[in-house]
Amino acid sequence: MKNARFLSSLVATVATLSLLAPSFASAERLNKTIETLAAGQAAFGIFSGDRSLSNARSLSRSELDYILIDMEHGPYDVETLQTFLLGMTNKAEIKATNSLAMNTTPIVRLPTNGREMNQYLVKQVLDMGVFGVLFPMINTREEAENAIASMRFPRAAGETDDGPQGLRGRSPGTAVWYWGTGYSEYLSKADVWPLDPQGELLAVIQIETQEAIGNLEAIITTPGVGAIFIGPSDLSADIGLPRSHPTVEAAIQTILASCIKHNVPCGITTSPNDIAERTKQGFRFATVGGDSGISPRTERALNIGRETAGRD
């Protein structure tokens, strides 16, 4: 009953924000993680499979830049995703800042691997209002291009760029009121950065296999890729060696070097023990925790990362 009242209140609040959208600066950046990365800074987040309202509220008030909502190793459930996103709506923050920009950016990791060339799951999570998608197991440029295309609306006649033509169908009503924009404004903002410098969607490509490393340059230079994320556990499993083995670390450094070369933010999972080193190496999209939420361990890693990156 309490949850029902809470959801009713949040739905009414976000719907009202959509009506009040013109009072906010239309040129403001809604995706603060993109704002951080575009400034050349490091962004820090966590993986989370806990889609409870209490966890959403806690994470939205934290100093985390983003949350990777894990629907790969957790259930793919759009309804619980919608509840979680509503729980991240911080009315006090909106009032205090007079800004629709969320303090912590929600990004979804999908359950499908790149070779499955999926599109409809991307459309569903974007239609709920998320600001980014993490695509696991991308091994080729073709798979990366499909990922980017699935996030984009088709271009209008006469509009061209270097990226793949959009494949996303138009029915973003929920996302429109969640973002607090008008329909036309949403369509103009809901494109991938940095291909569209004003785009508010972040496409994160996960590199987890030797095949992907063999196609690294082609994947990283795919127009529309906003960040690369290394999956060290699956990468080590694919190589057939422990995660701590020098060969695995050499593969990680190969990926990082290519990202730095092409000025594409690179991410990896970390802990308080290695976040400072990874940040110094050049990782700019590191996670600092998991489903324990903002535990003392996660908070310690976050603080170390922010201090090392010069963000405190």
Regions found by a protein language model. Name each.
Residues 14, 24-312:
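Expand to "…catalyze enediolate/carbanion chemistry for C-C bond making/breaking, isomerization
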Residues 1-12:
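Bacterial N-terminal signal peptides that target proteins for export
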Residues 10-22:
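Bacterial N-terminal signal peptides
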